């Protein structure tokens, strides 16, 4: 831990420099060249060396080798792809399925621009954006839960 030099604000020389705008980072250690040339490369190279060292000394085998003769019937993607996977399963036309799948990120990008109000305002005072977000969350949960069910029960979630 370094020693920080505290400025004496009663010093007339310092007050004159501050009045001229020369007080920024006047006290302390400058970032150039001390940090940027010496400390940052050491940290970056040390991190890379630790990562490579761990990978060489202790390699981890991820999962088990694939067996093409023992593939499960229901192959599922990772859980965060379930809603989009469900869209592809339920839409009969491949083109419209892919179109709906690619429209998901574009739909998410439009939500902040639905209402022209201050973005730091209380979200409950933005009823359109809040309702679109809540409806989208419910639909995503519905599609995500339906993706783990067989195709016959996926749209009704097995309830109807």
From Swiss-Prot:
InterPro entries: Cyt_b/b6_C, Cyt_b/b6_C_sf, Cyt_b6/f_cplx_suIV, Cytochrome_b_C_euk/bac. It is found in: Plastid, Chloroplast thylakoid membrane. GO terms for molecular function: electron transporter, transferring electrons within cytochrome b6/f complex of photosystem II activity; electron transporter, transferring electrons within the cyclic electron transport pathway of photosynthesis activity; oxidoreductase activity. Its main location: plastid. GO terms for cellular component: chloroplast thylakoid membrane. GO terms for biological process: photosynthetic electron transport chain. It is a multi-pass membrane protein. Keywords: Chloroplast, Electron transport, Membrane, Photosynthesis, Plastid, Thylakoid, Transmembrane, Transmembrane helix, Transport. It comes from the Eukaryota. The chain crosses the membrane at residues 36-56, 68-88, 95-115, 131-151. SUPFAM superfamilies: a domain/subunit of cytochrome bc1 complex (Ubiquinol-cytochrome c reductase). Disulfide bonds: none annotated. NCBIfam families: cytb6_f_IV. Belongs to the cytochrome b family. PetD subfamily. Component of the cytochrome b6-f complex, which mediates electron transfer between photosystem II (PSII) and photosystem I (PSI), cyclic electron flow around PSI, and state transitions. The 4 large subunits of the cytochrome b6-f complex are cytochrome b6, subunit IV (17 kDa polypeptide, petD), cytochrome f and the Rieske protein, while the 4 small subunits are petG, petL, petM and petN. The complex functions as a dimer. This is Cytochrome b6-f complex subunit 4. It comes from Welwitschia mirabilis (Tree tumbo).
């Amino acid at each position: 831990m370094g020693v920080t030099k505290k400025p004496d604000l009663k010093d007339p020389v310092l007050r004159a420099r501050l009045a001229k705008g020369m007080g920024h980072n006047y006290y302390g250690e400058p970032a150039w060249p001390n940090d940027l040339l010496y400390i940052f490369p050491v940290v970056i190279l040390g991190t890379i060396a630790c990562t490579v060292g761990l990978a060489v000394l202790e390699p981890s085998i991820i999962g088990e080798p694939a067996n093409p003769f023992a593939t499960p019937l229901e192959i599922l993607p990772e859980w965060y792809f379930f809603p989009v996977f469900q869209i592809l399963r339920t839409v009969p036309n491949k083109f419209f399925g892919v179109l709906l799948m690619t429209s998901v990120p574009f739909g998410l990008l439009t939500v902040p621009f639905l209402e022209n109000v201050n973005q730091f305002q209380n979200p409950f005072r933005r009823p359109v954006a809040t309702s679109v977000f809540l409806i989208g969350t419910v639909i995503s949960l519905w599609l995500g839960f339906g993706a783990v069910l067989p195709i016959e029960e996926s749209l009704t979630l097995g309830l109807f």
